[in-house]
Swiss-Prot record:
InterPro entries: aa-tRNA-synth_I_cd-bd (IPR045462), aa-tRNA-synth_I_codon-bd_sub2 (IPR020751), aa-tRNA-synth_I_CS (IPR001412), aa_tRNA-synth_I_cd-bd_sf (IPR008925), Glu-tRNA-ligase_bac/mito (IPR004527), Glu/Gln-tRNA-synth (IPR000924), Glu/Gln-tRNA-synth_Ib_cat-dom (IPR020058), GluQ/Sye (IPR049940). The gene is gltX2. GO terms for cellular component: cytosol. Keywords: Aminoacyl-tRNA synthetase, ATP-binding, Cytoplasm, Ligase, Nucleotide-binding, Protein biosynthesis. ATP binds at residue 239. GO terms for biological process: glutamyl-tRNA aminoacylation. This is Glutamate--tRNA ligase 2. The keyword Aminoacyl-tRNA synthetase applies. A motif ('HIGH' region) lies at residues 9-19. It is found in: Cytoplasm. Pfam families: Anticodon_2 (PF19269), tRNA-synt_1c (PF00749). Belongs to the class-I aminoacyl-tRNA synthetase family. Glutamate--tRNA ligase type 1 subfamily. The lineage of its organism: Bacteria, Pseudomonadati, Pseudomonadota, Alphaproteobacteria, Rickettsiales. Monomer. It catalyses: tRNA(Glu) + L-glutamate + ATP = L-glutamyl-tRNA(Glu) + AMP + diphosphate. It comes from Anaplasma marginale (strain St. Maries).
Length: 466
């Protein structure tokens, strides 16, 4: 049997971390077994679904490297097929039309809840084998009576639910539109899905979907439910209490390798390894290694992973990834000559930067035109050091261009401070402030060598004359 998995998001909102992890686990399982990973857009909620959102989900998945096989299946385009199955269930006596009003059902349900009882809707039309003419009703599947419904979950083991807990579910609305539950079962069957990996909040749906497949005489896929992701404090994520989506992590400057590694370790493990590449994961991934406890967001771990993967890149690779963030920081494109300058200093800056956005902010001084941006601390240093600034302009101008190297600059500055009775830390602070616009940089002598004598003196003069 060839393994076929699927990811089936609803295009009503961006790809969040829980959805991305579900997609990742399905993708890895398919790749691990030489199978296929399919993508289906579950857009039965036509009012809230958006083609733009669907496209953004596809783009975010591609950014993560989770490329799907075959064409994307659009659920709403298969409405005729879903309706056909519903009519077949009606013809087989497995479904019936219900004409009870929603208000009456809600009132009856509330009465049972107030009495501490479970409400299971019993429609007077349950045993009728035809629709009432001129009346709009919903089509319901007949749930079994007095039976335990069981299945072996790939993560949680055996799960059992009494049929008395399962309502006769609606499969066609009164307007004739198929419901989500019906569409999912039909699509999974027609797409030959063998394994479904999804969040544990779907277990109730799974029981109902199993009954639908059973009524049609279809085999059920292997279900694997994974624990949900909680926030850093251990609370469940919700619409109000949500984590950034995949697109937001992209904009914050995280690498797809880091996000995938992070998602993988939220629920799945291999020994005590934290760094697991996708290449390794496709060889190691198995359902058996998924835990049953919920996972919590850990921003420090994500930053650690991102820092690691950033430092696996070459200077050329990093520059390509960094360029959009630099241009956003600057508000304009970066000249090739300035990128070449940055390439000489970017590795040092990567030692501390955790994201591409961090790296862009830390490295922007290499590619800025005069006047460069200056943070508040650097401004204060410049404002109170005008006399020292004038002396430094003169001192830097006396250096022979051919000797403008980090080693010479380092020794020259030390000697100059001694002979001029100046505190060396004051000199370094001022050079950083006026040349880099901040007080924290790699070795200022190294920065000055990369920028060059002319650029450094021009920056010093600008602040002297301001």
């Amino acid at each position: 049997m060839r393994v076929i998995t699927r990811f089936a998001p609803s295009p009503t909102g961006s790809l969040h971390l829980g959805g991305a992890r579900t997609a990742l686990f399905n993708w890895l399982f398919a790749r691990r077994h030489g199978g296929q990973f399919l993508l289906r857009m579950e857009d039965t909620d036509q009012e809230r679904s958006s083609e733009t959102v669907a496209q953004s989900i596809i783009e975010d998945m591609a950014w993560l490297g989770l490329h799907h096989d075959q064409d994307v299946v659009i659920q709403s385009a298969r409405r005729e097929r879903h309706t056909q199955v519903a009519e077949e269930l009606l013809a087989r006596g497995k479904a019936y039309y219900c004409y009870c009003s929603e208000d009456d059902i809600a009132a009856e349900k509330l009465r049972h809840e107030n009495e501490g009882k479970h409400y299971r809707h019993h429609c007077p039309s349950r045993d009728a084998n035809h629709a009432q003419s001129g009346t709009a009703g919903v089509l319901r599947l007949k749930s079994p009576e007095n039976r335990e419904i069981k299945f072996t979950d790939g993560v949680y083991g055996e799960i059992s639910v009494s049929s008395e807990q399962i309502d006769d579910m609606v499969i066609l609305r009164s307007n004739g539109h198929p419901t989500y539950l019906l569409a999912v079962v039909v699509d999974d069957h027609d797409m030959c899905i063998t394994h479904i990996i999804r969040g544990s909040d779907h277990i109730t749906n799974t029981i109902k979907q199993m009954l639908l497949a059973e009524a049609m005489g279809w085999d059920n896929p292997q279900f694997c439910h994974i624990p949900l992701i909680h926030d850093e404090g251990g609370a469940k994520l919700s619409k109000r209490n949500r984590a950034p989506g995949v697109h937001e992590y992209r904009e914050l400057g995280f690498l797809p390798e880091a996000v995938c590694n992070y998602l993988l370790r939220m629920g799945w493990s291999h020994k005590d390894e934290e760094i697991i590449t996708m290449q390794s994961a496709t060889q190691l991934f198995s359902i058996e290694k998924i835990g049953t406890s919920h996972s919590c967001l850990d921003s420090k771990k994500l930053l650690f992973l991102n820092h690691h993967y950033m430092n696996q890149k070459t200077e050329l690779e990093i520059l390509g990834l960094l360029l959009p963030f630099l241009e956003q920081e600057l508000g304009h494109t970066v000249a090739e000559t300035k990128l070449a300058r940055l390439s000489l200093g970017v590795k040092k800056l990567m030692e501390r930067a955790k994201t591409l956005a961090d790296l862009a902010r830390d490295s922007v001084f290499y590619v800025q035109n005069i006047p460069i941006s200056v943070d508040d601390d650097a401004k204060q240093v410049i404002l109170k050091s005008s006399e020292l600034l004038a002396k430094l302009v003169g001192a830097m101008s006396q250096i022979e261009p051919k000797t403008w190297t980090k080693d010479f600059l380092s020794s020259y500055i030390k000697e100059w401070t001694k002979s001029n009775d100046v505190v060396i830390s004051d000199v370094y602070h001022l050079l950083r402030a006026a040349i880099a616009g901040r007080l924290s940089t790699p070795s200022i002598s190294e920065v000055m060598e990369i920028l060059g004598q002319e650029e450094c003196i021009s920056r010093l003069r600008f602040f002297l004359n301001s």
